[in-house]
């Protein structure tokens, strides 16, 4: 639900998934998100930002005038900016040279009680500038949370947002609720979190190293009598209940997506809840070890095989339009950031090893357009540059750019899904097989090469990927158009002799 916050800034609606390293088949840490917008046509570019590109620059947001002087020492990082920087950069997601991954943001809203005493700051930090001012300047996930928290403390926040961080050791989810208050939680190694446009972190343990939080947040809640929890003595501090919302809009637009994530990743937990339960768990254990494709399937879901699928045949007209699905025509891109889990080193040691090229490259699996119709492409983040064909997308439809080819797959597929479903499914299956083989082949080739040659192995691998994935997309689009032409209702049975 893209919406305007109290500050008047445009909000984007997204769905996020975070997976700890003991919950994946290969020990990877995964943070993932769909980037949605108010329109199906808000093109994205994929690029590698060189080290130091904005060092010492005064950054001024095109969205709300937020202004900050950036420090020196910025690292190289990957980014997915909008093609209209004058309206805000919106770099959204990436991995830097120290192998810190960040995805920003998961839009949310705080309730009126807390905003009354700590309102949004009109020209404070918002989604459009968040990745740009944090990711190049941190070397661990915890440093990412810390730097973002310090910026919010100094400049204020223009909106409520959730932010995902990961490194080789851990994943963190940070929720900025009000103008200056926030909480972050480390995702337990054997757990998963699914978030959908609501403040979601539950009980906060202020004595645990698994939580970080804004200075004075407990005093703020106590001073303004904001905690409604029952019980004598020290009452539980449930961040979701104190700062979050639970409205009819949430139960139609947000909560059902979390339930759908549970349905796909922990079905036995989903069975214990209704689609609109307000007490769905923030973190949970999946019913199996997960891979990138499992997380991608969750982000590609449109309530498949349920009565709530808007392009399905189960249920009725009412049920199919009742709840918002995870994947939308308005999804601009979907990403799964994969970082190899490392044991026996500290986060700081991992950062130093990453900067020397000694660790396996993180992978950004990205689907341009709507992920249930577009393939996830494994782009290696240790490449010095990404394929130029993915950069500088045209602001209006242009099939000469990959973004618009992938965007067209959704436009050609979902309106007459009964006609395109089989071909689209076969295409996605074929692309997954090719992508998984490609990622493994490049990964093994790079690790077998001398450290100083690995970056070039990754860059060549990305270039080869771009060639076949774009070519395959063009062929698939042509096949879809032919199928739709043959199935057109604007026809009539003809005499074969004419």
Task: Describe the residue ranges of each PLM region.
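Short Pro/Gly-enriched beta-strand edge/turn motifs at strand-loop
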Residues: 1-3, 72-76, 145, 312-321
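Short, charged, surface-exposed loops that flank catalytic or proteolytic processing sites
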Residues: 137-143
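Glycine-rich, aromatic-lined ligand/substrate-binding cores of catalytic
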Residues: 223-350
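Substrate-recognition/cap regions that form aromatic- and gly/pro-loop-enriched pockets
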Residues: 308-451
């Amino acid at each position: 639900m893209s919406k305007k916050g109290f500050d008047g800034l445009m909000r984007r609606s997204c769905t996020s998934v975070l997976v700890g390293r003991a919950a994946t088949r290969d020990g990877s840490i995964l943070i993932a998100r769909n980037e949605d917008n108010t329109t199906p046509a808000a093109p994205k570019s994929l690029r590698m930002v060189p080290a130091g590109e904005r060092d010492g620059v005064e950054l001024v947001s095109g969205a709300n005038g937020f202004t900050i002087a950036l420090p020196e020492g910025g690292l190289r990082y990957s980014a997915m900016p909008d093609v209209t920087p004058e309206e805000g950069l919106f770099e959204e997601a990436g991995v830097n040279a120290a192998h810190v991954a960040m995805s920003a943001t998961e839009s949310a809203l705080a309730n009126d009680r807390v905003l009354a005493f700590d309102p949004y700051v009109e020209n404070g930090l918002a989604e459009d500038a968040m990745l740009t001012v944090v990711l190049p300047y941190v070397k661990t996930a915890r440093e990412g949370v810390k730097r973002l928290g310090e910026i919010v403390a100094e400049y204020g926040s223009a909106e409520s947002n959730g932010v995902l961080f990961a490194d080789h050791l851990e994943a963190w989810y940070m929720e900025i609720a009000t103008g200056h208050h926030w909480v972050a939680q480390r995702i337990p190694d054997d757990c998963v979190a699914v978030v959908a446009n609501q403040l979601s972190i539950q009980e906060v343990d202020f004595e645990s190293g698994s939580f970080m939080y804004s200075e004075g947040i407990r005093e703020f809640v106590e001073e303004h009598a904001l905690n409604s929890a029952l019980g004598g003595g020290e009452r539980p501090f449930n961040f979701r209940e104190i700062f979050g919302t639970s409205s009819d809009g949430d139960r139609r637009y947000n909560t059902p997506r979390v339930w759908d994530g549970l349905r796909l990743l922990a079905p036995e937990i989903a069975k214990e809840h209704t689609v609109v339960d307000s007490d769905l768990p923030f973190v949970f254990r999946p019913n199996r070890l997960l891979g990138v494709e499992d997380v991608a399937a969750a982000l590609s879901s449109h309530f498949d095989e349920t009565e709530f699928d808007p392009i399905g045949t189960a249920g009725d007209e009412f049920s199919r339009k009742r709840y918002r699905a995870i994947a939308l025509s308005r999804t601009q891109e979907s990403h799964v950031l994969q970082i190899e889990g490392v044991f026996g080193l500290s986060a700081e040691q991992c950062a130093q090893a990453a900067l020397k090229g000694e660790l396996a490259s993180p992978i950004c699996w990205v689907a341009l357009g709507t992920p249930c119709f577009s393939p996830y492409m494994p782009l290696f983040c240790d490449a010095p540059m990404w394929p130029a064909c993915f950069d500088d997308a045209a602001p209006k439809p242009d099939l000469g750019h990959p973004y618009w080819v992938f965007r067209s797959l959704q436009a050609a597929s979902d309106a007459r899904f009964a006609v395109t479903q089989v071909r689209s499914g076969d295409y996605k299956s074929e692309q997954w097989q090719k992508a998984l083989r490609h990622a493994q082949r490049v990964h093994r080739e790079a690790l077998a090469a001398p450290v100083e040659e690995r970056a070039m192995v990754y860059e060549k691998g990305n270039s080869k990927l771009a060639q076949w994935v774009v070519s395959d997309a063009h062929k698939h689009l042509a096949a879809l158009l032919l199928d739709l032409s043959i199935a057109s209702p604007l026809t009539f049975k003809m005499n074969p002799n004419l």
